[in-house]
Amino acid sequence: VTIRNAMDKSTLVIETKILKKKIGKAYEMIGDSKALNNIRDMIDKVAPTDARVLITGSNGSGKELVAREIHNKSQRASAPLIEVNCAAIPSELIESELFGHEKGAFTSAVATRKGKFELAEGGTIFLDEIGDMSLSAQAKVLRALQENKITRVGGDKEIKVDVRILAATNKDLRKEIEKGEFREDLFHRLSVIPIQVPSLNDRKEDIPLLADHFLTMICTDYGMPMKTISKAALAELQKKDWTGNIREFRNVIERLIILCGKEITDKDVKQFA
């Protein structure tokens, strides 16, 4: 039994390493453009510190990739990276999600629950789409930043937390401040290091590398024979207006892989992209 347990554990370790490698590849920042290399330089400088970073950029540009890279290159890399999509959580639940709640704090609170700040202890919390967070939740996040303490919903006990905060938004927070939708003091606390992620339209020279990356990844995931893409097809992809950025580009490559033959041609791109 002991030998079997050891073998099972060994298999699990190998499987975990493979999974981490696979996940790592899925979250790589792909490209060699000047714009992307500038971002990499900033990440290398800021990652070893505990400085807060505000990552801005349009939808699908890869803001979460920047956050992951900062965490992975930080001294907190072995601790959790907890991601919270502030836009996906109803405003009445965001405080419970971030700070947890005590049993009986509200009707459905049947047990005490830790929030994301506690779950990220020793690591990093990534507040994605922070521009969509309610003002009351913003006030509590500000307190967590100032005092390194949180209080669960329905509780009065202060809980010390040790987390690094990274935030991202596709909104212009200065305009949100003018409209009274975002706290100016929180903005200044979060944006110690601002990083603007370039759109795909601003780094079209990365399209051949991105195409190759997604071709390999998607064909492997689907268990399909590897496909190629012609130079003319790449040129056609570089002409397009990528308003949906990397996310849209990946979807187009997936569509081309499914609908086209062994080699993706410029005609295929014109027809399906």
Positions of predicted regions on the chain:
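Nucleotide-binding/hydrolysis machinery
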Residues: 1-4, 14, 32-35, 74-79, ...
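Alpha-helical transmission elements in cytosolic ATPase-linked domains
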Residues: 2-5, 38, 69, 97, ...
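Flexible nucleotide-interacting loop at or near the entrance of a catalytic core
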Residues: 2-58
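Small-residue (primarily alanine) positions within well-ordered alpha-helices
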Residues: 6, 47, 67, 120, ...
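Conserved RecA-like P-loop NTPase ATPase core
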Residues: 19, 39, 61, 84, ...
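Hydrophobic aliphatic residues
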Residues: 20-23, 70, 74, 88-93, ...
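Conserved post-Walker A coupling segment in P-loop NTPases
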Residues: 42-108, 118-134, 162, 199-204, ...
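AAA+/SF3 P-loop NTPase mechanochemical coupling elements
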Residues: 112-122, 126, 133-140, 151-170, ...
